[in-house]
């Protein structure tokens, strides 16, 4: 296969949700793809700080972080678009008025409240319930003692994303009414949980994973047709919709599967390594 730019979501795609160690078989496939002349990038909702441990692997040339708000390639920052302060303050207030718990993601830190931890603790007790990959990431992160700073430590650092958990979808109504023109409300229901919890994230309409991919293509002189995007959840749609070849993991959402060109084996079944072979990347 001609040289490609390969973009990989993390949770539920590259790794089982919430994990930080790349399986040996996957790492070998990544290294082999790089040796064959392909360039690999993380493409994730995680902020820069949460991608750093993975970026230390020499196989990655950069990353689309914060769902496109912060983009790196070969050590150079290509995109850096935090929320405007009044925008972040306003949407956060509209959510919190209805009891929605938020975590605030800056480039190098994540801030969250005690109540957010308590709500995820409830999910910890529901381990038998199948969760979407974003929910599982947070559940696992809390279980492992995720390094989250208290909201009281937040001093106005530029924010790239707000993650939320609501008791009911209707709790988001005011924020959507006021800010739907500025943010994409990327929501997922917490399957099999009778309390009606909804988790998700706010993505600034100024960017998305797709615009991050385009920024890297422009920087390196590639076209979108030269890209391959791997994802598993609805927040990967903006990535897979622009990729030359789009791949959804077998453990992914039904919505994403319908929009992608290919279905790879599950993240739990060496899906990346197997699909790299199927595509002729290795």
Question: Where do the language-model regions lie?
Answer:
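Mg2+-dependent phosphoryl-transfer enzymes with acidic/Ser/Thr/Gly-rich catalytic loops
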Residues: 1-5, 23, 199-282
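Asp-based phosphoryl-transfer active-site loop
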Residues: 2-19, 91, 240
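Active-site phosphate-binding/coordination module
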Residues: 21, 27-131
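Short active-site oxyanion
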Residues: 37-41, 59-61, 160-161, 225-226, ...
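Hydrophobic packing residues within well-ordered alpha-helices of enzyme cores
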Residues: 51-55, 175, 256, 272
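Short, structured coil segments at secondary-structure junctions
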Residues: 58-59, 67, 179-182, 242-243, ...
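Short hydrophobic/aromatic-enriched beta-strand-loop microsegments
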Residues: 60-67, 184-188, 246-251, 264-266
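Conserved acidic, metal-coordinating active-site core of Asp-based
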Residues: 109-228
